[in-house]
Amino acid sequence: MTSLNPVLTIGYQLTEPMREHLGLSRSEARRRAIELLEMVGIPMAKSRIDDYPHHFSGGMRQRVMIAIALSCDPQILIADEPTTALDVTIQAQILEIIKRLREELGMAIVWITHDLGVVAGMADRVAVMYGGYIVEEAPVFELYANPKHPYTQGLLKTLPNLEGQRAERLKSINGQPPNLNQKPLSCSFAPRCSQTMERCLVENPVLENRNNNHKVACWWNP
């Protein structure tokens, strides 16, 4: 939502890509822009199309960004942290909008997020990345039920458990993330891993299929 240019109206920012890439006239692009704003739930879209970004709340600006992303009819939408900095209520609204648009428009969505709750509710297949590499990839239910990489296991253990009689201390993954300026010659997670073996310190594991289309990049295989 901070990607919007503060000195240009949302109408201009919406119509520009359509005129450039779809060859629409000014009036056609404006008409389509109003339709897109209505599609993402902007009230009184026709009268608000000439407003500036600061006239909108954070959640409404995020809806405008979704409208811009959809303006050229993509087959794949890349959603990079689409709910960051939004409160829980607005986050749920944005997720419902994207979910509805996915069904209505028949497009695929690539989610990039650190929110495991969003992943569980929105994804069909999940790729877990660490240090710039995919360390585990599986169908979403399989991944949550049977995580195989120590990093994935650690991530899931950090989620608060609301069941039970008493609250438990949240668990964390010890250590620090790797230096991404240096290409690893061994497993990037090894310094933080509880299952580290000698091979982990000298050789970088490759992503391989274990079972049920469940891929893991780890030398540890219990």
Which residues does each predicted region cover?
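P-loop NTP-binding/switch modules centered on Walker-like glycine-rich loops
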Residues: 78-82, 86-168
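ABC nucleotide-binding domain "signature" region
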Residues: 28-40, 155-158
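Short catalytic/signature loops enriched in Gly
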Residues: 43-46, 137-222
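A short, proline-enriched helix->beta-strand linker immediately N-terminal to the Walker B motif
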Residues: 71-75
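ABC-type ATPase nucleotide-binding domains, specifically the catalytic core motifs of the NBD
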Residues: 4, 12-28, 38, 42, ...
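Conserved ABC ATPase signature
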Residues: 51-56, 60
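Hydrophobic anchor residue at the start of the ABC signature
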Residues: 14, 66, 90, 94
